[in-house]
Amino acid sequence: DEVGNGNPHGPQDTHNFTLLLQELRSQLDAQGSADRKHYLLTADTPSGPEKVSHIEVGPVSRIVDWMNVMTFDFNGPWETTGPTESQSNLFPDPFDPAPRPTRSKPYPDNGEISVAEVVANYLAHGASPRKIAISIPF
C-alpha cells in the first residue's frame, strides 16, 4: 500500500537520490559558470535512523550546499502513552513518558530521540559538520 507508507522506496533509490542530486549540482554549476552565479542546492533530510539509512549521507553532504535536518516532531498527539513531550528537544529526556524502543539504535537505550543524537548520527554517517543545518519547530 504505497499511500499508507509515506514515501515508499526500493533498494536502488538510495543511490538514485545521490545521482539525482549530483545531476542537479552539475546542471546548476554549468548554469552558474555561464552567468557567473552560484546556485544553492539544499536538501531537507529526516531525523529517524531508519530513514537516514536510506540516504548516502557522506556523498550527499559533499554535493549539496547544506542539509536541512528535520529535527522536529519528535513527539506529538499520535502517541498513546500520555502527554506529549518536547517537539525538538536538544538532549534526551530521561523522564519522557513515551520511549520508543524501535528507535533505540543509534539513540540511547530508552529510545529517546534528540537533536544532539540526530546530529551525532549524521556525523557518524560521514556528513560534513559545515553542511548540517538543524530545522526546529516554530
Report each predicted region and the residues it spans.
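Substrate-binding surface in catalytic domains of secreted glycosidases
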Residues: 2-138
